[in-house]
Amino acid sequence: MDIQTLRSEIKAWERAYADKHGRKPTPKEVKADPIAKKYHLYNKFKKAESAGTGPSTPKRASKLHSSLNYKPVSFSVKTPEKQISKNRRRSVSKQQHADIVTPSHRSLTFSKAPALSRTPQKQLQDTPKAATPKPSPSVPLGPTPSIHGRVVSLLEGLDGTPVKEFATPGNVSTPVKVVSITSETPTNKPALDVNDEFTTPAYLNRISVDVSPFEKRLSFAERIRQSVVESPIKQMSPEKELSPANQTEEYDDDEDAWRELEGLPPKPKEPKIVDVTFDGEEPDELDEIMGTVEVHNPYDEPVQDDLDWVHETALEGETALSAPIYKEGGIKKRKHQTQKRTTKKAIVRVESEQHKKAKVDNDNFSTTNRLNTGFKVNMGQKQWASRFKK
């Protein structure tokens, strides 16, 4: 029994056991089965093969050789006999070439050229006609090119194709158009000795900036600024702290945002106190000059009106709930709250006879003064002139 057959039978039994039990057999199970004899025989063959005394596994023939029925090539070495005659010399020259037989599917046979022995052989040249004549350029060529009866090509026996001579000043040549340097296509490489406005300055090239993935989003100018700040050559001053006024404004903004979130009314603004100083005259003298003239400034109005508006807005809900209730036909109904007045209330009064008479007397006052003094002076002018008297 061959070792390959034993191995295939053992593998087939192991696969069948694994399909049945779901696992490979253990050594105890192998010994309990009749397949143990084949295991023992397989190990015996393996030991004999490793020692080199037992039967060896035959090598597998390649597919190419098996398909062509390849057989080892046999070479036949024949020693040529000495032949003196002319016909015999021709036959020897033919036998020196290897006869190659067309390979068939059944067998391949090759005949090797005669081996060269180390012992020198006698030359088989009896007459000088056996030597191959060298071609001579003086031999005339006939209609069919041939040299000593051997057909040659048209160019054989010649020295070669003549080489074209280079143009010399004496020879006539076609004039070549001279290309001017200014008409050449400019190259992309700029001149090194020309100061270009687009080139990077040298002091920027000397600065080594390690760009991190976060700093790649920054501009080039920002990266240069950071490198200058971090360099020990020049230290920039730290950022200035905010002034108290700016800190107060930030605090007020935060407080307003908190009030909006809580639903509280906005914080009332405090009136600004401005100290006004006068150069020259004192405030008392200025009051005497100006008199009782009052200048209306809308920004000087008190803030109390704004506070009242805030309280009224906050109490609108309570006022609506506390509105009086009226009874109509035994059904209680709450009075609807109307819109708040947006215009100033005007009081219309009817003039009496006494007011009309006093108005007529005031109109006639200017006429009487004009007749007595010769000047037209009304009551308003008199009051304004009396203020500037000392």
From Swiss-Prot:
Amino acid composition bias (Basic and acidic residues), ranges on this chain: 353-362
Chain intervals for the UniProt region annotation (Disordered): 46-148, 232-256, 353-372
Biased composition (Pro residues): 134-143
GO cellular component: cytoplasm; DNA replication preinitiation complex
Keywords: Cell cycle, Cytoplasm, DNA replication, Nucleus
Polar residues: compositionally biased ranges: 363-372
InterPro entries attached to this UniProt entry: DNA_rep_checkpnt_protein (IPR021110), Sld2 (IPR040203)
Subcellular location field: Cytoplasm; Nucleus
Identification of the protein by name: DNA replication regulator SLD2
